[in-house]
Amino acid sequence: MATIATYLLAAVAEIGGCFAFWAWLRLDRSPLWLIPGMASLALFAWALTRIDSDLAGRAYAAYGGIYILTSLVWMWLVEGSRPDRWDTLGTVLCVSGALVIIFGPRGGQ
């Protein structure tokens, strides 16, 4: 469960950091949004290094599914737009793949 929690921390940090840039450039918010945004992106990068994986590529691949799930939760809770059935189906497929990568047996590795 610690792995999933770390992936969720990374996802929230990345989405929050990227949203700060979105707010500045697309929603006409103050450039001061970039200060917490950059700190959040640094937290995201740090969190991914805490994943229990010997290979960065595998950690990033598994993260992708968790990122998609978290992005759609963000869209719903922060932006007020509920995911549709295609968002949900795509998320189920991606998270299923991420879970296979995270929990799949690694013979000899």
UniProtKB/Swiss-Prot annotation:
It is a multi-pass membrane protein. This is UPF0060 membrane protein RC1_3291. It is found in: Cell inner membrane. The chain crosses the membrane at residues 4-24, 31-51, 59-79, 88-108. It holds the Pfam family UPF0060. One of its GO terms (cellular component) is plasma membrane. InterPro entries: UPF0060 (IPR003844). The keyword Membrane applies. Keywords: Cell inner membrane, Cell membrane, Membrane, Transmembrane, Transmembrane helix. Belongs to the UPF0060 family. It comes from the Bacteria. Signal peptide: none annotated.
